[in-house]
Amino acid sequence: MARIRVPRKGVTQAELADVLSRRLGGGYQVEPDGDGRVVVRRSPLAAAVVRIRDVPGATVFRVHGGGLPLYRIGTTRRVTDALRRSPEFRSV
């Protein structure tokens, strides 16, 4: 599990899904699941689940892998890198 803290407060599922879709490109299917999570799929065997949590002065994303272990590691790593490098979450 990766934990990414960004200094921007109040990030929504829709914003997160939009940013991940742009950053990851067309090879990934990004969908909010309506339960405070966004699911990123590369194939039926590889997925990453991003949970959104608001904390004072920031938003925390927790990224978990889903699917077969060999495949989920790469997907989770790409999602984590995309979140860490996204300037959209750096400030309001």
Regions found by a protein language model. Give the residues of each.
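A conserved amphipathic terminal alpha-helix motif
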Residues: 68-92
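Short beta-strand element of the conserved SAM-dependent methyltransferase core
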Residues: 2-7, 39-41, 49-52
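A general secondary-structure boundary signal
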Residues: 1-3, 35-37, 57-59, 64, ...
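Beta-strand/loop substructures that line and gate deep hydrophobic ligand-binding cavities in soluble
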Residues: 44-77
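Terminal, regulation- and interaction-focused segments at domain boundaries
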Residues: 1-27
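Short beta-strand-to-loop capping motifs
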Residues: 5-11, 42, 63-65
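Amphipathic, interaction-prone secondary-structure segments
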Residues: 27-49
